Amino acid sequence: MMEAVHATEEWQRAGVHYIRIQAMCVGFDIPPRYEFADDTKDSEYILVHENGFPVSTCRVRIDEENAGHIERVATLEEYRGKHYGALGIKAAEQLLKKRGVTNIRINSREKALGFYEKLGYTPDFSTRSGEGEFVCIMTSKTL
C-alpha cells in the first residue's frame, strides 16, 4: 500500500535519507556533504512508502514571509512515473495548508517542469538558474 506520512519517527527520517542518498548522491554523483548541507535537525520531511519501504520524499519549509517551500524532492529511480512523487507533493501541500500557508514554491529542475505543472504549479522563467542537469526554474502555486 502506498502511503505518505509526515516523517517524525526515526525510521521514517532514515528512509528520507536513504532515498536522497540513492536518488541524488548515487544517481547524480552529488557528494553527501553538498546534498545535506542545508539540512538541520529541525528539517521537516514527507516520506512516501510502499508497504513500509521508502520510495519518495520531499522537505517542507515555511519562510519568514509565510510562503511554503517544497524542497529536495526525490524518488527512487525504479518508482518514478508511478505517482509516488505526486502523492508526496500533495501531502506536503496539505501539511503547509494546515499551517496557514496559501502560497507554495518549488524550485524545479527544468526537466521536471511538466511534473509540477500537472500538479498546478506555474513556472517563472525569469528565475532560471544553475547549469547542466540542474538548470532550475522557480514554480509557484496558490492554495
Please report, for each region that a protein language model flagged, where it lies by residue:
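Short amphipathic alpha-helix that is part of the acyltransferase structural core
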Residues: 1-35, 40, 45, 49-53
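Conserved acetyl-CoA-binding loop-helix of GNAT-fold acetyltransferases
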Residues: 75, 81-94
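C-terminal "cap" of GNAT-fold acetyltransferases
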Residues: 109, 129-143
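Conserved acetyl-CoA-binding loop of GNAT-fold acetyltransferases
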Residues: 117-126
